[in-house]
Curated annotation (Swiss-Prot):
The keyword Nucleotide-binding applies. One of its GO terms (molecular function) is sulfate adenylyltransferase (ATP) activity. This is Sulfate adenylyltransferase subunit 2. Its EC number is 2.7.7.4. Belongs to the PAPS reductase family. CysD subfamily. Residues 278-301 are annotated as: Disordered. The lineage of its organism: Bacteria, Pseudomonadati, Pseudomonadota, Alphaproteobacteria, Rhodospirillales. It holds the Pfam family PAPS_reduct. It comes from Azospirillum brasilense. Proposed to provide activated sulfate for transfer to nod factor. Sulfate-activating enzymes, NodP and NodQ, may be physically associated.
């Protein structure tokens, strides 16, 4: 495998140190696995951090029931290939109520099937540290997130109740009832992630690569018709377009972009010319002003 460029080598070393610090400091950590490119890089780093031993904590996937079919297939194949321990949790109460991203709306769907589901899973299994792949460059509320981000007993985030983190002086100590979200990729950018994927040959979901896919125009975004549950509006017909996804979530809430980038190298070239956020395709970010910060205060990823 080629030698990493110096900037990626430093980012890798920092992330591995954070993962080892987490394993040493907490009783029951868990790695949040959302199946996207950041989760893939995070999992690769975790395997490196503890090699030749297995990853010393399980993976947790909060399944809303509305992920792309290719994402679920990729998740299951990855777990089998690497021999990982995966916990899949769904908010059964929300499912019984029929909460979904179409009829219920993105805000309610996200709160019930993602935020409440995550809190349920953390409480049920007693996890005191949840390791996630969020990065500070993604969104302004994440820009002020600490590497070790304190959550109260209700898993809520208060930006005023966070500790200083000077240089690499992390503070993983918590009070009884508290937990933390740990973000080893805090200082990475989207371009860093893709360069690392290329350098380390990390597999990613094929949806990241351009291909002909059936899409409809919804809320200013190109929404892929992934299965028969997406109702078509009167006069609406899916069209085949060459698109890819910069970010992946529930398929009715994830907008595609027109693209010809069919390889990781193509994506890197595209990223170098891009002047827009990767989260432009996430419909949940536009629910209301400061919606991401409000979601995080409620316990979102």
């Amino acid at each position: 495998m080629p030698t990493l460029p110096n900037d990626l080598r430093l980012l890798e070393a920092e992330s591995i140190a954070i993962l080892r610090e987490t394993a040493a400091s907490f009783t029951k950590p868990v790695l949040l696995y959302s199946i996207g490119k950041d989760s893939g890089v995070l999992l690769h780093l975790a395997r490196k951090a503890f090699h030749p031993s297995p990853v010393p904590f399980p993976l947790l996937h909060v399944d809303t029931g509305w992920k792309f079919r290719e994402m679920i297939a990729f998740r299951d194949a990855t777990v089998r290939r690497l021999g990982l321990t995966l916990i899949v949790h769904r908010n059964e109460e929300g499912h019984a109520r029929g909460i979904d991203p179409i009829r219920s709306g993105s805000a309610l769907h996200t709160r019930v099937m993602k935020t409440e589901a995550l809190r349920q899973a953390l409480d049920r299994h007693g996890f005191d540290a949840a390791i996630g792949g969020a990065r500070r460059d993604e969104e302004k509320s994440r820009a002020k997130e600490r590497v070790f981000s304190i959550r109260n007993a209700a898993h809520a985030w208060d930006p005023r109740d966070q500790r200083p983190e000077l240089w690499r002086l992390w503070n993983p100590r918590i009070q009884p009832g508290e937990s933390v979200r740990v973000f080893p990729l805090s200082n990475w950018t989207e371009l860093d992630v893709w360069r690392y994927v290329a350098a380390q040959s990390i597999p990613v979901v094929p949806l990241y690569f351009a291909a002909e896919r059936p899409v409809v125009h919804r809320s200013g975004a190109l929404i892929m018709v992934d299965d028969g549950r997406l109702p078509l509006n009167p006069g609406e017909t899916p069209e085949m377009r060459r698109v890819r996804f910069r970010t992946l979530g529930c398929y009715p809430l994830s907008g595609a972009i027109d693209s010809d980038a069919a390889t990781v190298e193509d994506i890197i070239v595209e990223m170098r010319a891009s002047r827009t956020s990767e989260r432009q395709g996430r419909l949940i970010d536009g629910d209301e002003p400061a919606s991401m910060e409000r979601k995080k205060r409620e316990g979102y990823f």
